[in-house]
């Protein structure tokens, strides 16, 4: 009995105590997720207010119990101890005081029921609070993940121009339908109207993206508000009411015992009285357990219902929002595709009626028609979106309807020749005509109206009545042949500019020049001024048409002189398959805003932010060796010279307004060299200008030749075609008229570019290859305008041709190593591409991730997504001071005392850091822009990539910082004292190897800051990778030229040559910056 009493009384007083073990298991079992702070606090407040224990029965029971003195102010522990004393005195006999004390214990049990239930409810509330907060936090996490995915999708819509991307896959298909002047017209119109459509459609995309972001913000707010509202509604009904039935019964029994004097009746033994009290306590215990169990059961039900409600709210809101955004994104792609198709179809149909040279009489109507078509389509899509909230793409036929009609003969016709355009169209048309985004004044051949060209137009009006070679554009008129066009422009240009060596482009207004100069100055701050662009000109008519069609060879010497004045980097003229003429020269900073650079191409949309470029033109080969001599005759007529300038400028123009190329060069990315424009000409007397470019990026074969041949991957990544002399005549003429500089103004070093896949420029193999490969290397070394003395004139070129031994070409393909076939590169290119500076220089960490969103011109943004994993490189740069330039003694330069100091040596070596990566293969570094459209951003690849980059930099941060901080001075001193450059005298044979070998004559170790050691992983890799193959750089093939270049000092007879850093302020020092994490 005693044990029963002890157990019962003790259990009653500890029932309300929470279990610590249970709490720990709950915390271990639950993952810790948290919703937004407002939601979390609201959940706590709701449960605190709703889950209160109703103890109203106390007001009914306690007053009467107190009247009988059945409540005592003692604590439960005191009562327990008195119960113990009572049990020990049970056999001592009846006692009124003892029975009263026992009865009071029952009253105090009743009193403790409320507190016990409240404590149990408090624990249940805490568990429920944790559960609901965790559930809401998990849903919030899921919502955030979906939001990030949607934002990524929206970012891709903005960063990759949809319309340009969608239309690019159709450009080559449509181009194949055309040939001759129809293809010219297509190539002239397509980039302009596509970019106009891109700008129009880009506004719609931005609006969709902005409103989609608003939807995501609304989703967050709505979810949070609905969570709080739902929980309030649910738990407002979840109040806790004590089951007072048994409590009332026990209290009544206790009162009855007091009324009946059982406590003071001596006839009732202590044992009997204790039995009655224990029965009452048992009933109180059962009552307490029932109350708590029922409450827990109810709360679990409410909790489950609340979780279901929150999940339903999440699903309803997310489904509605994300489904809408997904549908709109998908439909935007379809809409862009249809608009692109409509524009291309319209241009193709109109190409039967117009040509780009003879669009002038009806160009106004044509352009307004096209612009109206594009604008109307975008406005219609936007109107539907405003009404329904969804994008409904128009079909391409709907877009074309009402503007372009097709008759039975499949010829095009502009329906409305009396168009009354809106004011907005007129404003856009003005921008289209003058200097802006879609300027058509891009070449000498295109005849356009302009205020600055009145005299020229008057001349044309006078010539038109008598010159039958200028037909009026009409559906029924045949397009003029290329020969006629050539003759026309020979006459026109010759009469317009009889005494001007470098004519301005007709139609190029002063405002345009100012605009472009300003754009270029701004672009210098963020754009690397060097790249190598390749424009392919394929003559499908055969070699016989060379003289009468292109006139490139006939004016080569004149073209060199003109291009030297405009100062791009180099011009490489490829003659035939794999054979090239190299015209390399350095840009003058003050002349980079010449009209030649400002011109816009007929095949691409361009940007004015590239101070210098290298253009490579795959030109038509000549018939014989005599033709080359004839075409290089300095006595060529002025009209042929101008014709050559026109032809090449027309082909090379238009690389500067390309937003993608500008941004890619800024961040050092490569682009593809594929040639989507292919056509087959039916006329053997016409030359089709085929742009090797992807319409998506509007590029004409961008090469960034900065691969390192001695790194494990360079050979496979970039392998230019081997140049082999023609077997018909081994008496080649090699023109080398320069003093080569190790550091020309082609600052490829400033770019953060990486190796790319081999270029596969599509060239037409001709029946007969030219007799020779003429390598013409020309340098302009001074940054001052007065340094025009370095320009090579025609007589000097002729003299140089004759001065070269004919026997050299027999071993031309046997340069120092079998891998060194870079004959289409200058010495400086070779040094950079082979760049292993033996002094190692100091490393500047350039860790790059090609996942970038970059603003292009005209609000067209570009995004680069890696194909797989990224490779890591360190860039090594050098700084040189007080190195004096002296002109070559062999060059016919008037002033031989020009001196320039070199501030920086921009010879970049991209040293691989992860050479042991199993994915370190060329297929993993392909960033072909057209393929990016099919790629997806894989977060699983991006996240570890960023993590890796951070860890690599942070683990070696002190070493890198010390190297950069302390290594500059030492390296500058060492490199200045050892820097030598070979100027070609008898060593033209070793053009690609000698300079790279003799760039620095002594081998030193990388500067190791005191205390850092040379044991960091990055530094070890640099030492390992940059030292390899240095000893045997020039061991093969030297036997062929032992009589020419047996002693290195023979090649070093000239003074040291470096030059001033171009394109940066004089006080700018890029090497004093600390290592930065991307």
From Swiss-Prot:
Note the InterPro entries from the entry.
HHV6-IE
Q: Where is this region: Disordered?
A: 1-28, 464-483, 703-732, 781-818
Q: State where composition is biased (Polar residues).
A: 1-12
Query: Which Pfam families does the record associate with it?
Result: HHV6-IE
Q: What is this protein called?
A: Protein U90
């Amino acid at each position: 009995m005693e044990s029963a009493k002890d157990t019962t009384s003790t259990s009653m007083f500890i029932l309300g105590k929470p279990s610590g073990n249970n709490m720990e298991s709950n915390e271990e079992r639950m993952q810790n997720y948290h919703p937004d702070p407002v939601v979390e606090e609201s959940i706590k407040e709701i449960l605190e207010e709703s889950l209160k224990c109703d103890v109203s029965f106390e007001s009914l029971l306690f007053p009467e119990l107190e009247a009988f003195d059945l409540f005592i102010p003692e604590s439960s522990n005191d009562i327990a101890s008195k119960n113990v004393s009572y049990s020990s005195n049970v056999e001592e006999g009846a006692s009124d005081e003892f029975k009263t004390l026992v009865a009071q214990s029952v009253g105090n049990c009743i009193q403790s029921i409320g507190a016990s239930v409240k404590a149990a409810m408090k624990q249940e509330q805490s568990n429920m609070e944790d559960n609901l907060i965790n559930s809401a936090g998990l849903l919030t996490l899921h919502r955030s993940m979906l939001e990030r995915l949607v934002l990524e999708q929206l970012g891709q819509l903005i960063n990759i121009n949809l319309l340009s991307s969608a239309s690019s896959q159709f450009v080559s298909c449509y181009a194949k339908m055309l040939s001759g002047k129809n293809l010219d017209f297509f190539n002239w119109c397509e980039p302009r109207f596509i970019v106009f459509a891109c700008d129009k459609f880009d506004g719609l995309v931005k609006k969709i993206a902005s409103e989609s972001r608003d939807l995501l913000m609304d989703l967050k707010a709505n979810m949070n508000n609905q969570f709080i509202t739902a929980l309030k509604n649910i738990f407002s009904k979840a109040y806790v009411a004590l089951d007072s039935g048994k409590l009332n019964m026990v209290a009544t029994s206790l009162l009855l015992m007091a009324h009946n004097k059982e406590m003071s009746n001596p006839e009732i033994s202590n044992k009997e009285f204790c039995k009655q009290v224990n029965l009452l306590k048992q009933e109180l215990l059962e009552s307490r357990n029932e109350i708590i169990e029922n409450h827990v059961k109810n709360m679990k039900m409410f909790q489950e219902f609340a979780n279901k409600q929150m999940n339903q709210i999440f699903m309803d809101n997310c489904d509605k929002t994300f489904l809408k955004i997904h549908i709109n994104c998908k439909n935007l792609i379809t809409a862009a595709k249809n608009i692109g198709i409509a524009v291309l179809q319209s241009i193709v149909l109109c190409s039967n009626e117009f040509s780009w040279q003879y669009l002038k009489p009806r160009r106004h109507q044509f352009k307004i028609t096209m612009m109206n078509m594009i604008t109307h389509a975008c406005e219609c899509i936007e109107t539907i979106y405003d009404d329904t909230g969804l994008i409904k793409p128009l079909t391409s036929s709907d877009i074309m309807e009402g503007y372009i009609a097709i008759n039975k003969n499949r010829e095009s016709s502009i329906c409305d020749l009396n168009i009354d355009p809106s004011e907005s169209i007129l404003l856009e048309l003005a921008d289209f005509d003058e200097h802006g985004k879609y300027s058509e004044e891009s070449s000498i051949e295109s005849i356009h109206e302009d205020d600055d060209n009145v005299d020229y137009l008057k001349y044309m009006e006078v010539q038109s009545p008598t010159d039958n070679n200028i037909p009026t554009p009409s559906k029924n008129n045949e397009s003029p042949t290329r020969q006629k066009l050539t003759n026309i422009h020979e006459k026109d240009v010759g009469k317009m500019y009889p005494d001007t060596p470098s004519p301005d482009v007709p139609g190029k207004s002063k405002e345009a020049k100012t605009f472009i100069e300003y754009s270029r100055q701004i672009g210098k701050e963020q754009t690397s001024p060097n790249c190598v662009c390749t424009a392919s000109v394929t003559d499908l008519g055969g070699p016989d048409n060379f003289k009468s069609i292109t006139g490139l060879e006939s004016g080569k010497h004149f073209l060199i002189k003109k291009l030297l004045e405009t100062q791009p980097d180099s011009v490489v003229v490829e003659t035939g398959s794999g054979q090239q003429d190299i015209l390399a020269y350095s840009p003058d900073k003050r002349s980079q805003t010449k009209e030649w650079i400002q011109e816009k191409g007929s095949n691409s949309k361009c940007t004015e932010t590239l101070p210098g470029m290298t253009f490579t033109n795959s030109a038509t080969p000549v018939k014989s060796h005599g033709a080359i001599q004839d075409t290089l005759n300095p006595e060529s007529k002025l009209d042929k010279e101008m014709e050559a300038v026109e032809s090449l400028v027309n082909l090379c123009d238009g690389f500067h307004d390309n937003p993608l190329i500008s941004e890619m060069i800024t961040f050092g990315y490569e682009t593809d060299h594929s040639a989507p424009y292919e056509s087959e000409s039916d006329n053997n007397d016409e030359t089709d200008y085929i742009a090797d470019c992807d319409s998506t990026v509007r590029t004409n074969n961008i090469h960034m030749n900065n691969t390192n041949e001695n790194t494990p991957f360079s050979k496979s990544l970039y392998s230019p075609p081997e140049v082999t002399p023609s077997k018909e005549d081994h008496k080649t003429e090699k023109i080398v008229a320069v003093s080569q500089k190790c550091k020309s103004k082609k600052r490829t070093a400033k770019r953060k570019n990486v190796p790319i896949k081999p270029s596969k420029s599509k060239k037409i193999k001709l029946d007969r290859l030219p007799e020779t490969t003429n390598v013409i290397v020309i340098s302009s070394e001074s940054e001052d305008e007065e340094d025009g003395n370095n320009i090579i004139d025609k007589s000097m070129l002729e003299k140089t041709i004759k001065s070269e031994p004919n026997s050299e070409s027999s071993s031309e393909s046997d340069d120092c190593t079998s891998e060194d076939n870079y004959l289409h590169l200058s010495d400086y290119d070779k040094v950079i591409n082979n760049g292993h500076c033996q002094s190692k220089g100091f490393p500047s960490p350039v860790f790059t991730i090609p996942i970038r969103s970059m603003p292009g011109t005209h609000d067209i943004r570009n995004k680069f997504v890696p194909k797989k994993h990224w490779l890591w490189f360190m860039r090594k740069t050098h700084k040189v001071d007080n190195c004096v330039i002296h002109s070559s003694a062999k060059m016919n330069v008037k002033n031989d005392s020009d001196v320039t100091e070199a501030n920086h040596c921009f010879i970049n070596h991209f040293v691989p850091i992860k050479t042991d990566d199993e994915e370190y293969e060329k297929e993993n570094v392909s960033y072909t822009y057209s393929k990016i459209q099919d790629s997806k951003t894989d977060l699983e690849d991006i996240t570890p990539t960023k993590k890796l980059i951070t860890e690599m930099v942070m683990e070696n941060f002190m070493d890198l910082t010390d190297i950069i901080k302390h290594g500059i001075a030492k390296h500058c001193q060492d490199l200045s004292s050892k820097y030598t450059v070979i100027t070609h005298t008898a060593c033209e044979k070793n053009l690609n190897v000698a300079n790279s070998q003799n760039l620095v004559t002594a081998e030193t170790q990388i500067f190791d800051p005191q205390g850092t050691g040379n044991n960091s992983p990055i530094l070890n890799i640099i030492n390992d990778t940059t030292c390899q193959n240095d000893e045997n750089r020039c061991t093969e093939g030297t036997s062929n030229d032992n009589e020419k270049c047996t002693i290195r000092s023979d090649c070093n007879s000239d003074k040291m040559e470096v030059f001033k850093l171009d394109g940066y302020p004089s006080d700018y020092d890029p090497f004093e910056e600390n290592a930065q994490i991307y």
